[in-house]
Amino acid sequence: MDEFVNLKETELRLGLPGTDNVCEAKERVSCCNNNNKRVLSTDTEKEIESSSRKTETSPPRKAQIVGWPPVRSYRKNNIQSKKNESEHEGQGIYVKVSMDGAPYLRKIDLSCYKGYSELLKALEVMFKFSVGEYFERDGYKGSDFVPTYEDKDGDWMLIGDVPWEMFICTCKRLRIMKGSEAKGLGCGV
């Protein structure tokens, strides 16, 4: 039985070597709260008193910083106000326009135009080409380029195949392609 008397010396524990489990309250506070902050003696005494009471109440929560960094909330509010303004003023319908052989894209607002004729004139001026005339049966004649658009389903169609209001609702982007590539899009092209 004497063999088991000296168990304290060989016991494994989480404390530092050479220290006993029983610490004074002040030492316990300084050991546990090692967060490199200066502590006033009055604060240490209050912590000791509150830990000795061991009440069932939870400690007060820290105030949560909401919306940090403030730039993000500023941007969010700014974007929301711009969205509300655009809804009231009438929303623009912007689509990208590309032309085969042109190294750049353009973006236009379809709501600025009242019909296909105005749109085609604007495209001719923008990309410096001529469209020719559109015939219901033959498509576009008299030009090497054919104006097409991609609808919401992802299909490429000739500009002028559907009524203008339907075109505005379904158009995702415009492409002025070469007539040789546009075979099969229209009736006779």
UniProtKB/Swiss-Prot annotation:
Residue numbers spanned by region Disordered: 42-65
GO-annotated biological processes: auxin-activated signaling pathway; response to auxin
Xref: Pfam families: AUX_IAA
UniProtKB keywords: Auxin signaling pathway, Nucleus, Phosphoprotein, Repressor, Transcription, Transcription regulation
Description of post-translational modifications: Phosphorylated by phytochrome A in vitro.
Domain PB1: 92-179
Domain notes: The N-terminal half of the protein contains two conserved domains I and II. Domain I includes a slightly degenerated ERF-associated amphiphilic repression (EAR) motif which seems to be involved in the activity of transcriptional repression. Domain II is required for the correct degradation of the protein through the SCF-mediated ubiquitin-proteasome pathway. Interactions between Aux/IAA proteins and auxin response factors (ARFs) occur through their C-terminal dimerization domains III and IV.
Function: Aux/IAA proteins are short-lived transcriptional factors that function as repressors of early auxin response genes at low auxin concentrations. Repression is thought to result from the interaction with auxin response factors (ARFs), proteins that bind to the auxin-responsive promoter element (AuxRE). Plays a central role in auxin regulation of root growth, in gravitropism, and in lateral root formation. Regulated by an auxin-induced protein turnover. Formation of heterodimers with ARF proteins may alter their ability to modulate early auxin response genes expression.
Stated name of the protein: Auxin-responsive protein IAA3
Organism: Arabidopsis thaliana
Originating gene: IAA3
